[in-house]
Amino acid sequence: MERFEITKTPINTENIIKKVEKREAGAITTFIGTVREWTNGKRTVRLEYEAYEPMAVQMLAQIGAEIEEKWEGASAAITHRIGVLDIGEAAVVIAVSSPHRKAAYEANEYAIERIKQIVPIWKKEIWEDGEQWIGDQLETTAYPNGKPDLSEGEQHD
C-alpha cells in the first residue's frame, strides 16, 4: 500500500486513513482539499490538474519523511488527484497519525503548505468567462500561454 500517490481516479478518503492507522496513534487528522465554486470573485466551472508524476510522488514522499522527522511517531499518507475535477470533488487528501492530536494537526497543516511549495503540480482554473493555468500551488505564478513543457527543459522549483 503506497502512502504517497498521484491518481487520475476519485480519491477514497477511508483508504488514505487506513494507510496511517497504527496502534501507537492517539489521533488521526485528515485534510480534504476540494474544488470550490468561487475563487477571487470568479465562478469556477471545473479545475484541471497536471503533474510531473515521478517527481510529484518523490516530493510527496519527501514531505512524509519531513513530517516523521519533525513530529516523533507521526506517519503521513498523501494522495493528489490529476485530470478534470468538478465542483466539490477532492483534489488532495492528507492523513496524519500521531500519538498526540496537536502533532497530528500541526503535521497535517505542514503537509498542505509543503505540497504548495515543492510538488510539481499545475492547475488550470476554468471559469464561466475564461481559463488560466496556475504555475504553482501557491498561486503566485500564472502561465497565460499554458503550462510549462518539461520536455523543453523548463523546470518547476
From Swiss-Prot:
Any GO CC annotation of this UniProt entry: cytosol
Superkingdom field: Bacteria
EC identifiers of the protein: 2.8.1.12
Pathway where this protein functions: Cofactor biosynthesis; molybdopterin biosynthesis
Family matches, as Pfam families: MoaE
GO BP terms in the entry: Mo-molybdopterin cofactor biosynthetic process
Positions with a binding annotation for substrate: T34, V35, R36, T44, H100, R101, K116, K123, K124, E125
GO MF term list: molybdopterin synthase activity
InterPro entries, A to Z: MoaE_sf, Mopterin_biosynth_MoaE
Known partners and oligomeric status: Heterotetramer of 2 MoaD subunits and 2 MoaE subunits. Also stable as homodimer. The enzyme changes between these two forms during catalysis.
Function: Converts molybdopterin precursor Z into molybdopterin. This requires the incorporation of two sulfur atoms into precursor Z to generate a dithiolene group. The sulfur is provided by MoaD.
Protein family (similarity comment): Belongs to the MoaE family.
Name of this chain's protein: Molybdopterin synthase catalytic subunit
Source lineage: Bacteria, Bacillati, Bacillota, Bacilli, Bacillales
